[in-house]
Amino acid sequence: MTGHEALRRVRLIQISAGRPPVVATAAALLAERTGAPVETVASLDAALAPGVFQIAAPTRSSQPGQPPDPRVDIQLRPDGSGRLVSGGGRMLYAAASYLVEVLAGGDIGRLEAGISIVPTFAWNRSTYDLFLTQEGRIQRGLDPESYVRQLARWGFTHAEVNALASPMGLETGPKGEVYPMFYTYCPALDQFVSSSLNKGLYPFYYLSANLATLKRNAALARKYGLVPGLTCFEPRSVPEEFFARYPMLRGPRVDHPFRSFRPRYTMTLTHPRVCDHYAEMVTALMREVPDLGFLNVWSNDSGAGFEHTKSLYVGRNGGAYMIREWKDDAEIAKTAGTHVVGFLRLLRDAACAVNPDFRVITRLESF
């Protein structure tokens, strides 16, 4: 008997109440292929009745505090009964696709007793997702849901979701300057939410539209079992209007002088008020999307940079609070590195107050 023949004998697909959204998505895929209805029950029966196929995503983990066990269990019997189980649901849609598109084409064989698949990597994360969140997001005919569905089908577990709603950010510059183009990708936290420090710096309609796009992408990720996350250039420059209001919070110059016609500056991360500003923004974002799972920080390029790091395009520079500029290179580098780590820890701690599994990642080659 082939898997296709066994699937034709499925009469009912069962999922449990309180399941992650991806369980319903995987059930819909199986229902489409089998014609069987989907039933939600209080709990799944351990004994499989003929023709009943169960789909589940238990939150089992290998160790306390660790991510869900990524193991996938697939069982399909000749009478149409079976199970599809993926810890946490991260690989559930990929497993459902694999069952109906690949395994079903062969002999039922080992599927009758059940097989287990342990992915080599528990994380398969898109990095600089050109089509969903970066420059390619504005191409004609792009369907975000089809794209996210394909990510899940390929076995991705995490997806970037922070994208601008418009083709370009609100960064402006002198006539003929190309530098504003560098702000269309990896948008910073302040493109989605504000804090008590920078409230009003960007118009509400702009922030709300961007946040709505982020939340749409996060909902799609959730639907297909992917963990939503962010890739941001941080700390990124802010409009000069901000420093007219708070001149003491000016940080390093971060633009590339070959490409910019005017300097750009970030806030100084050594001032407590700026640290509070970042913590407030992370908290606000987590309040909107509590299951955000990661923040990938890129820096020292595209209008972002850490003060007093040597790889800034105009060289070491920054505010007056971190260290005196006449100190030697080794001492400045050590102090700058300590503050970089402190900033990343600040972001993590603010997010972990909502999602304890949140992770902060950084790209090291630019330093």
What are these regions (language model features)?
Residues P37-P68:
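Short, well-ordered secondary-structure micro-motifs within conserved domains or adaptor modules
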Residues V41-L44, F233, V360-F367:
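Acidic carboxylate-rich catalytic motifs and surrounding loops in phosphoryl-/glycosyl-chemistry enzymes
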Residues R273-F367:
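Active-site neighborhood of glycoside hydrolase catalytic domains
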Residues L29-P37:
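Short helix-loop-beta junction
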Residues E5-A6, V10, Q14-P21, A26-L29, ...:
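Feature activates predominantly on carbohydrate-active enzymes
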